[in-house]
Amino acid sequence: MSDDRKQIKRALISVYDKTGLEELARTLDSAGVEIVSTGSTAAKIADLGINVTPVESLTGFPECLEGRVKTLHPRVHAGILADTRKPDHLNQLEELEIEPFQLVVVNLYPFKETVASGADFDGCVEQIDIGGPSMVRAAAKNHPSVAVVVDPARYGDIAEAVAQGGFDLAQRRQLAATAFKHTADYDVAVSGWFAQQLADDSVASAELEGDALRYGENPHQQASIVREGTTGVANAKQLHGKEMSYNNYQDADAAWRAAWDHERPCVAIIKHANPCGIAVSDESIAAAHAAAHACDPMSAFGGVIAVNREVTKEMATQVADIFTEVIIAPSYEDGAVEILQGKKNIRILVAEHEVPAVEVKEISGGRLLQEADVYQAEGDKASSWTLAAGEAASEEKLAELEFAWRAVRSVKSNAILLAHEGATVGVGMGQVNRVDSAKLAVDRANTLADSAERARGSVAASDAFFPFADGLQVLIDAGVSAVVQPGGSIRDEEVIAAAEAAGITMYFTGTRHFAH
């Protein structure tokens, strides 16, 4: 027998699912294992004619509060948590007249099944197990001394361990890992359900508070806006124009994030959550707007404009000449709002910038949560990029590449963005392969403005790696002078070879910016 096996002399069993219980109890009883059990589990074992110690006999305290309190007692948990490798623990158990457990068998109240059954709120809450997870976690923590089993499918392993003199340490560790995952999944189910209840309450509350929108993405969809805190697009103050729509809010948020991705004065023009144009300028915010608009004047018609600086009268005059749905900025120069108000329907918003912490997306059966994608990764800094091909870029060219890299984050994947002199000149978005995105970016650069072939001499950013050299080759053939991309493809060497052959500069960031 291995030295690290723990002979099973005493077992604690508390199970909601009684599958396999009879065979397990008979196996333990025939091996002379003392069985301590709770409630209906103890009753079931006793009905089989097997010796069992009810937990209340152990604790000297009756089950109470409709079974809510059964095992939450020091005489139970000390027996589970005592590290029998430590003489001090053994001495304390002896002083307290507590016997240690070597095996804990627990499965939990069927919370997921109760929710799936359509039970009401109180019914679901009643099926949140408290004592069970406490015992499981205690036993898993103390796996050097205790084996914990949470799945009836593993009862055969218990029988085998009893025959072999107990579970060895490696087996107990594996059982502990399984147990911690079991309780973690259980807690996620409970917390997710509670979050859903609160979300439902929030939507209902928002409707009652008058935050309902005219309709959703389409007229047949109901919609509302739930405002939290005092900053960001949701809490923007509207100075003029028609009521904000669901789509207005979506595009305003996309534009707001795109503009604030840049530290320099920036204007982003968005339509259907994709950039028509983004530009920065240290000369003036009006110059940035003119450059952003020039990227794709046709698409900018009816777009949403976001600005990360004060809107000047000069810029307001430019905007007033173009049909614009929404403009959002942190402030407006005296007289700028009056100029914009010359357009009856333009929605003029003023907002305080907020960096989102978490993004939430509803999916069938639940929701996805992730840390918001802002420029926080180390690879987002040009100083950390790796030169993969060609000569190192000049300071001016590197600044162009960094602008393109910051701008491409706001483009729906697959995303290729061409830039020149601090402005986008061609954007390829939302294609299911990177070659088509590259072709689209080049086509838009060369056909959507008065000056032909804007792609030639521009720089390019790709939100993810090129899986083959073909996407890069489209950019090379169009005359792109430098490229920044994450790298990381298994065919990086082919892509690098294509860049080297063309004599262009290419940097790897090591960071990806997918946007779906």
From Swiss-Prot:
Annotated SUPFAM superfamilies: Cytidine deaminase-like, Methylglyoxal synthase-like
Molecular function GO terms recorded: IMP cyclohydrolase activity; phosphoribosylaminoimidazolecarboxamide formyltransferase activity
Keywords tagged on the record: Hydrolase, Multifunctional enzyme, Purine biosynthesis, Transferase
GO biological process: 'de novo' IMP biosynthetic process
Matching CDD domains: IMPCH (cd01421)
Catalytically driven reaction(s): (6R)-10-formyltetrahydrofolate + 5-amino-1-(5-phospho-beta-D-ribosyl)imidazole-4-carboxamide = 5-formamido-1-(5-phospho-D-ribosyl)imidazole-4-carboxamide + (6S)-5,6,7,8-tetrahydrofolate; IMP + H2O = 5-formamido-1-(5-phospho-D-ribosyl)imidazole-4-carboxamide
Known EC number: 2.1.2.3, 3.5.4.10
Pathway where this protein functions: Purine metabolism; IMP biosynthesis via de novo pathway; 5-formamido-1-(5-phospho-D-ribosyl)imidazole-4-carboxamide from 5-amino-1-(5-phospho-D-ribosyl)imidazole-4-carboxamide (10-formyl THF route): step 1/1; Purine metabolism; IMP biosynthesis via de novo pathway; IMP from 5-formamido-1-(5-phospho-D-ribosyl)imidazole-4-carboxamide: step 1/1
Source domain of life: Bacteria
GO CC annotation terms, alphabetical: cytosol
PROSITE patterns the UniProt entry points to: MGS
MGS-like domain: residues covered: 1-150
Domain remark in the UniProt entry: The IMP cyclohydrolase activity resides in the N-terminal region.
Family: Belongs to the PurH family.
Protein name (database record): Bifunctional purine biosynthesis protein PurH
